[in-house]
């Protein structure tokens, strides 16, 4: 794929200069030096008197420069050193944001009030409340914020809390880039990962629990890419116990496990995931089982229209109607079925009925899944769930933002389209309060990702035995 001037327009100047310097230092420059020497000699000058400037770009042929930039943008080999530079730059950006941008109070005080009740001995979930409402997240959320409660002087040291939240942000970013590298993604996809205003806000300005859930999600994806099935299930289930949004990955995880391990081991890992939920919830389950399940995994929760980011353009009456809710549920199920038959089961070489029959008759032969396929399957399941969700709030961007560049790349779109959709999506999620136009863009950007993956069912595969650095 030719990037041409697109690379020049999208890669920041400092990164380009650094890349050129490293390329000139690390690649053999003898041929270029001979050409320069011959040119100088033809002008009657002494070769030793010529001292080329390191940054003199005029001495580099335009085609050579474009090739250099194209290689920088498209060759996964460069991810190894570009990613750490971007993470370092983002760490500086986080520090500047914490220093210069005021903290926004939304749920932090409520979280601290709820945790205070828990630490005081309350174990009935229905009685744990704060100033903005009852506790509606599973047990791991309570444990994490209990630690933060102690570290931040009962929630009063906001600056320290922001610094602590920068740690999971940068950790998640590092894991995300590792997942991209494992999948053989080109370096031009890395830049959008560090430029999201909304992501920085979710983590270090609003202190939402979605940051910890997103970290668990990406660690699980990384472990699945490494074929660490048990560890991946444990981390994913722990993430579900922080926020149940991670249940959107469950269909993809089931497919990946069954394809890789067959039916019985997959059922055992599913039981392990359930067991983790029980173990984490024991302090609350033992006091009020129904209350804990109803509050922490409330699937029938009625969302308020004024906070929705995605479906505002349909109007409040339709948004709140049961028919609309059922239609989205039907669409969700239909898309999962379509993806299972057309995309996710492709490695098995079987249609869905035949695949199920082989599993039940224990005749199914497991397959080795590529890291690219595993990541695409899990993130497409996430995108389907977000597209069909009746209400998305701003903090849900913590799950979507880092998935979008990879999904758009997997659709086969040109890099310009990838960047355009990322920019449109970022714009829409930064409009507050949401408008009919911004919510429409949110839905369209998700639809582009889902339909694009469905249309290009094979995606972009990187062979597992490839000699390239990124899969070693």
Swiss-Prot record:
MF-aspect GO terms: dol-P-Man:Man(5)GlcNAc(2)-PP-Dol alpha-1,3-mannosyltransferase activity
Keyword Nucleus tagged: no
Pathway stated in the Swiss-Prot or TrEMBL entry: Protein modification; protein glycosylation
One term under GO cellular component: endoplasmic reticulum membrane
Reaction(s) catalysed by this chain's protein: an alpha-D-Man-(1->2)-alpha-D-Man-(1->2)-alpha-D-Man-(1->3)-[alpha-D-Man-(1->6)]-beta-D-Man-(1->4)-beta-D-GlcNAc-(1->4)-alpha-D-GlcNAc-diphospho-di-trans,poly-cis-dolichol + a di-trans,poly-cis-dolichyl beta-D-mannosyl phosphate = an alpha-D-Man-(1->2)-alpha-D-Man-(1->2)-alpha-D-Man-(1->3)-[alpha-D-Man-(1->3)-alpha-D-Man-(1->6)]-beta-D-Man-(1->4)-beta-D-GlcNAc-(1->4)-alpha-D-GlcNAc-diphospho-di-trans,poly-cis-dolichol + a di-trans,poly-cis-dolichyl phosphate + H(+)
EC number: 2.4.1.258
Regions of this protein lying in the Lumenal compartment: 1-5, 102-131, 179-201, 260-264, 345-371, 417-436
Subcellular location: Endoplasmic reticulum membrane
Recorded coiled-coil stretches: none
Transmembrane stretches, start-end: 6-26, 81-101, 132-152, 158-178, 202-222, 239-259, 265-285, 324-344, 372-389, 396-416, 437-457
Superkingdom as given in the UniProt entry: Eukaryota
InterPro entries noted in UniProt: Glycosyltransferase_ALG3
Cytoplasmic topological segments: 27-80, 153-157, 223-238, 286-323, 390-395, 458-472
Keywords, sorted A to Z: Endoplasmic reticulum, Glycosyltransferase, Membrane, Transferase, Transmembrane, Transmembrane helix
Topology in membrane: Multi-pass membrane protein
One BP term from GO: dolichol-linked oligosaccharide biosynthetic process
Family: Belongs to the glycosyltransferase ALG3 family.
Function text: Dol-P-Man:Man(5)GlcNAc(2)-PP-Dol alpha-1,3-mannosyltransferase that operates in the biosynthetic pathway of dolichol-linked oligosaccharides, the glycan precursors employed in protein asparagine (N)-glycosylation. The assembly of dolichol-linked oligosaccharides begins on the cytosolic side of the endoplasmic reticulum membrane and finishes in its lumen. The sequential addition of sugars to dolichol pyrophosphate produces dolichol-linked oligosaccharides containing fourteen sugars, including two GlcNAcs, nine mannoses and three glucoses.
Identification of the protein by name: Dol-P-Man:Man(5)GlcNAc(2)-PP-Dol alpha-1,3-mannosyltransferase
Taxonomic source organism: Aspergillus clavatus (strain ATCC 1007 / CBS 513.65 / DSM 816 / NCTC 3887 / NRRL 1 / QM 1276 / 107)
Gene that this sequence comes from: alg3
């Amino acid at each position: 794929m030719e990037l041409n001037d697109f690379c020049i327009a999208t890669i920041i100047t400092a990164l380009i200069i650094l890349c050129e310097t490293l390329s000139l230092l690390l690649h053999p420059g003898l041929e270029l030096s001979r050409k320069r020497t011959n040119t100088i000699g033809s002008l009657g000058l002494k070769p030793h008197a010529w001292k080329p400037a390191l940054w003199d770009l005029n001495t580099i042929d335009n085609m050579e420069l474009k090739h250099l930039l194209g290689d920088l943008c498209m060759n996964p080999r460069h991810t190894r050193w570009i990613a750490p530079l971007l993470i370092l730059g983002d760490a500086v950006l986080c520090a500047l944001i914490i220093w210069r941008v005021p903290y926004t109070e939304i749920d932090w005080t409520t979280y601290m009030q709820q945790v205070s009740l828990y630490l005081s001995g309350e174990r009935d979930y229905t009685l744990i409340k704060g100033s903005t409402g009852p506790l509606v997240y599973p047990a791991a959320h309570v444990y994490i914020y209990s630690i933060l409660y102690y570290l931040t002087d009962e929630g009063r040291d906001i600056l320290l809390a922001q610094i602590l939240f920068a740690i999971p942000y940068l950790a998640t970013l590092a894991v995300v880039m590792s997942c991209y590298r494992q999948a053989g993604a080109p370096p031009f996809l890395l830049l959008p990962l560090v430029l999201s205003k909304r992501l920085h806000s979710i983590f270090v300005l609003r202190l939402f629990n979605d940051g910890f859930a997103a970290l668990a999600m990406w660690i699980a994806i990384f472990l699945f890419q490494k074929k660490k099935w048990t560890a991946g299930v444990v981390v994913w289930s722990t993430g579900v116990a922080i926020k149940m949004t991670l249940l959107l990955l469950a269909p993809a995880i089931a497919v990946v496990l069954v394809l890789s391990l067959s039916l019985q081991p997959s059922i055992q890992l599913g039981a392990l995931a359930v067991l983790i939920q029980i173990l984490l919830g024991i302090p609350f389950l033992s006091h009020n089982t129904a209350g804990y399940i109803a509050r922490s995994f409330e699937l029938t929760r009625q969302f308020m229209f004024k906070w929705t980011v995605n479906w505002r353009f349909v109007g409040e009456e339709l948004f709140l109607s049961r028919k609309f809710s059922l239609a989205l549920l039907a669409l969700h199920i239909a898309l999962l079925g379509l993806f299972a038959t057309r995309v996710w089961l492709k490695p098995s070489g079987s249609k869905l009925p035949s695949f199920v029959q082989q599993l039940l008759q224990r005749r199914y032969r497991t397959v080795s899944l590529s890291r690219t396929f595993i990541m695409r399957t899990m993130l497409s399941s996430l995108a389907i769930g977000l597209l069909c969700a009746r209400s998305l709030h701003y903090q849900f961007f913590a799950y979507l933002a880092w998935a979008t560049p990879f999904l758009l790349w997997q659709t086969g779109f040109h890099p310009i389209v990838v960047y355009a959709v990322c920019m449109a999506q970022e714009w829409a999620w930064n409009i507050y309060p949401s408008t009919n136009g911004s919510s429409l863009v949110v839905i369209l950007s998700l639809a582009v990702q889902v339909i694009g993956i469905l249309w290009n069912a094979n995606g972009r595969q990187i062979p597992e035995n490839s000699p390239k650095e990124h899969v070693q």
